[in-house]
Amino acid sequence: MKTASFARIRLGITAGFCIAVMLFVPFTSAISDQTSSQTVTEPYQYHTYDALTDELHSLQENYSSLMSLSSIGKTYEGRDLWMVKLSDNVETEEEEPGVLFMAAHHGNEWPGVEICLFFIRYMLENAQNSSLPEVQNVLNTTQIYLIPMVNPDGVTADTRKNCAPNHGPFGKKPTITSYGVNLNRNYDDPWFLAYLFPLRYYLPMILPDASFNYRGPYPFSENETQAVKHFTEAHNFSISISYHSYGEFIIYPWMHTTKQTPDEMLFRSVGENISLINGYYLLVKNDRLIPLYGGTLGSSENWLYREKGALAYTVEVGNERRPTSPQVVFNLCMTQTTVHLYLCQRAQTIESEKAALHQT
């Protein structure tokens, strides 16, 4: 049984790579006009929260049959957390595989926002393009969810954390002691482990509320992570990517230990395909951030996998935190759109692949 399961998943790698190659050729040619029209001598202009909000509303008005836009919550400073859904029946929760893409948990990491927005435009503008039938096929068979800016306050302030006031590491002090929580350390898995293994997980570094990795007084203490939690609990999806920058590598659970998940083989299969498309290094088992950096406690990936069973990845895009070259940014967007299309197609078989993997 295990041999048969392994063969099925290895076949998924080969098939996935073929899909990726087929998608990439028309995709790159379809947007070549966009890239050539950019003035490469001028720095790339990243979308602010207000610019993103305006563009999302404009796209929703123009493509209302394929795109819905809703706020899943408010930040401490009152900004909406926008969620985009793409589907051929966008107002209906269908029994179709879902995928989720998120960006900007860290407010000073902006390329992921551009990747998500570019993908939204690409899907909408090419939905009726007869030379790109895979776009219509994906819209017909997949429910695509995007939260392109998880941390609007942090993006606006250009800071890693959000902007909520802290009252000491446990939230007990009467006065404000610092500002901001690292949202990708605020999920409830395995948030409390640092207290059991303080040296392994560098508790003295992550406990002070002024630390750039401060994880909040308790799990899901922040408006932003609460919103993601409530949204994901109400929707089904098989695969997710959370974008960060930078490093050009791919990470998957477990994020805090070298111990493998029950779906290690499937995580590797999908991850290897992502790597084939974008050329990034897939961190597996002992390549992980353990024990060199103590691992990542409270990440969205761990929580999404444990709570939803989703194959949840972090993709660290690019080799600089905020590239200024328009060509570099467009290349990131182009490549990751190909990744997105592959994942939407692979999502069609993920549950059956899981069943095959766990046959006894």
Where would I find each of the regions flagged by the language model?
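Extracytoplasmic/secreted envelope proteins and their assembly/folding machinery
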Residues: 49, 53-56, 60, 116-120, ...
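C-terminal accessory segments enriched in acidic
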Residues: 41-45, 197-360
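Surface-exposed patches in mature extracellular/periplasmic domains of secreted proteins
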Residues: 66-73, 129-136, 283-288
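Active-site/substrate-binding loop(s) of hydrolase catalytic cores
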Residues: 95-102, 110-260, 314
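Short glycine- and acidic-rich boundary segments immediately preceding or forming the N-terminal edge
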Residues: 31-80
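Conserved phosphate/anionic-ligand binding catalytic regions in large, soluble enzymes, centered on
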Residues: 106
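Secretory targeting signatures
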Residues: 1-34
